[in-house]
Amino acid sequence: MSGSVLSLARPAAATNGHNLLTKQLNCNGNGTTGGAAKTTVASAITPPKQPQLAAKVIQQSQIVCFDVDSTVICEEGIDELAEYCGKGSEVARVTKEAMGGAMTFQDALKIRLNIIRPTQQQVRDFIQERPSTLSKNVKRFVSHLKAEGKQVYLISGGFDCLIAPVANELGIPLKNVYANKMLFDYLGEYDSFDINQPTSRSGGKAEAIALIRKENSDDSLITMIGDGATDLEAVPPANYFIGFGGNVVRPEVYRRAQYYVTDFEQLMGQ
C-alpha cells in the first residue's frame, strides 16, 4: 500500500474500570430527515478509545464506509418498521434469538419480514410519517469527508427503500449504497427480499467492501465505521474499523475495537 499509514494493530482490550452504563439521550443532533427529535440509548460514561489516532485514520483514508442503523441514524430501521406495522414485540423476540446465535442473519431477516409483511404503501407511509433521525454531527462529518475528496459509502443490513432518504439528506449517491431490497408483487403486497444482495447474509459487509475495493484502486485505504459486530468483522477487506457508540454501546464491540468514538466530531480532528 502506497503512502505512510498507521499500523493496523490487533484490537485493544477495553479500558479497565469503566462499566458500560446506559442513559437516554436526545438524538436530534445537527439535523434529521424530518420529524420530531427522538431518544436512543448510549453510554453514560463510556470513554472514546484513541480518538486522535482514529481521526488520523480518517485523514489517511480514501474511502469511508458507514453502517446505517444506530450509526448514521439513531434508530434500527426494521424494528421501527415492525412497530409501525403493529408487529414490534414479535419481531423483537426473533431479533433476540438471532443475537443469541440461534439462526443465521439471512434466516432472521426472512422470519422478521414474514412477520411484518409490509405492503408497498405501508413502506411509503412509514417513510413519510416516521423519517429517520440523523445522528449528532454525522451530516457535518460527511460534508467534511466529501470536501476532503473522500468517497463515502453506506453499507447496511437494512433496506434501500428506507435508506435512500438518508443518503439523499447526506448527499451520498445511491450507487454508493449497499443494502437489502424488498420485493413486492404486482398488487404491492410483500413477496420476499433479494437474497443476492451481499448484505442479506452473514459476512455481507465484508463482501460489499470487497466489491468497493474492486471498483477502486487496490491500494485505497478503506475505513469502516459502525456500532455492531458485523461492522467490526468487515476488517479485512477494510483496512480499519472505528467503533461508534453515539447511540448505543455494544460491550463486545467496544472491547474488541482498537478505535472507538461516541461523537462524529471526534473524527474531524477538532
Swiss-Prot record:
Enzyme class of the recorded protein, top EC level: hydrolase
Cysteines engaged in disulfide bonds, as pairs: none
Pathway assignment reads:
Amino-acid biosynthesis; L-serine biosynthesis; L-serine from 3-phospho-D-glycerate: step 3/3
Residue spans crossing the bilayer:
none
Cofactor(s) it depends on:
Mg(2+)
Q: Which domain of life is it from?
A: Eukaryota
Q: Which residues hold Mg(2+)?
A: 67, 69, 227
Q: Gene3D superfamilies, alphabetically?
A: HAD superfamily/HAD-like (3.40.50.1000), Phosphoserine phosphatase, domain 2 (1.10.150.210)
What Pfam families does the annotation carry? Hydrolase (PF00702)
Question: InterPro entries per the record?
Answer: HAD-like_SerB (IPR050582), HAD-like_sf (IPR036412), HAD_sf (IPR023214), PSP (IPR004469)
Q: Which residue positions are annotated as catalytic?
A: 67 (nucleophile), 69 (proton donor)
Its protein name is Phosphoserine phosphatase
Recorded source organism is Drosophila melanogaster (Fruit fly)
